[in-house]
Amino acid sequence: MKVLVVGSGGREHAIVTSVAKSPRVDKIYCAPGNAGIAALAECVPIGAMEFDKLVAFAKEQAIDFTIVGMDDPLVGGIVDVFEAEGLKVFGPRKNAAILEGSKAFSKDLMKKYHIPTAAYENFTSAEEALAYLETAKMPIVLKADGLALGKGVLICNTLEEAKAGVKEIMEDKKFGTAGNTMVVEEFMTGREVSVLSFVDGKTIKIMSSAQDHKRAKDGDQGLNTGGMGNFSPSPFYTKEVDDFCQKYIYQATVDAMAAEGRPFTGVIFFGLMLTEDGPKVLEYNARFGDPEAQVVLPRMKNDIIDVMEACVDGRLDTIDLQFKDNAAVCVVLASDGYPVSYEKGFKISGLEKFDGKDDYFCFHAGTKFDDNGDIVTNGGRVLGITATGADLKEARKKAYEAAEWVDFANKYMRHDIGKAIDEAK
């Protein structure tokens, strides 16, 4: 069969890597792809938001199955456009992708269906938000309602910071129309854990847990980013936590969406906070995380096409989802200055060292070919260096070793990815 993957990041490289392992797949295309994906798939110069061009390409090439990795096209309704043309596509429809596309929607859904989450209020007026904050308990969390590249969340320790945050989100429109509505949420403390799942509209199957590192600098300092590294599984995601989430969160979310007439098909990413009062939902994403996909997919035993097709066909209950009893750690190599300003176009050396190594993966995010055919940096997050091992400590050691194999002029990484592994009992 012929498969088209839509997107261009490390997550899409991880998806393409899994698809390439399927004996059912003869040909992979990726739009627009990147320099790493090009080793496994034919990259097509069509942007992820160019729905008409993507549909025309899928028809022209007789694509059997399309996988959408990114949030923007999903929230924008790419699945509806493909389905209307009779094309098979993996991902939620527009009316279900709102689970990620609007934080206000997802908070209201959780409240209505009693899914554990932080107390909150939604605001469409900056004045009302400011009045509410005058009497609110600090610290407090402000969230832009819409998509903001994972950066639309502000944690405010004082009233002054909160007022500045309202100005930034609602008045200065730092995140554009994503800030037309704003969620104000109680600040929760605990450990953050990500859990990825496959969903077919009614059945949900949990993949594995992972733990992200959002801040740009060591010691969780600096600005929020799309993610600087990751490990899977999380040692803090215990059987007790899983039992609670299975009972009160996972199926409850799928059932809530179905009850609202918005059946969800695709991947639901649960961002959880493990609080003293039990697990609570921080956020939902309507797709694989990045770099969560890079640590979870290499551990999956199943043929990814079998699982994704079962989701689309509504027969996920027939799939026995299995993961290796191992661990993975991903360290992101970024351009120095990310997530604010950074130079790009630097030549990357050492990529060939990953060839033929089973336990090591170099997932490309911000890379491209220059005019000479050399692979150069082309973004803030450049590569996701991932290693698997028998346990988290071994995987971490291997990932940091492999991070030294590659070099480019403004290479930057965190040196404490997975430090929480040492804190686990």
Q: Model regions: which residues?
A:
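ATP-binding N-terminal substructure of ATP-dependent carboxylate-amine bond-forming enzymes
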Residues: 1-94
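Active-site nucleotide/adenylate-binding loops and adjacent lid/helix of ATP-dependent enzymes
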Residues: 4-5, 100-182, 211, 235, ...
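Generic C-terminus detector
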Residues: 367-372, 376-425
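Solvent-exposed alpha-helices and their adjacent loops that cap or buttress functional pockets
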Residues: 20-21, 36-38, 60, 90, ...
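Active-site "cap" helix and flanking loop/linker of ATP-utilizing ligase/carboxylase catalytic domains
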Residues: 245-268, 285-357, 370
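Internal nucleotide-binding/catalytic subdomain
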Residues: 156-293
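Short, conserved charged micro-motifs
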Residues: 53, 129, 161-164, 339-342, ...
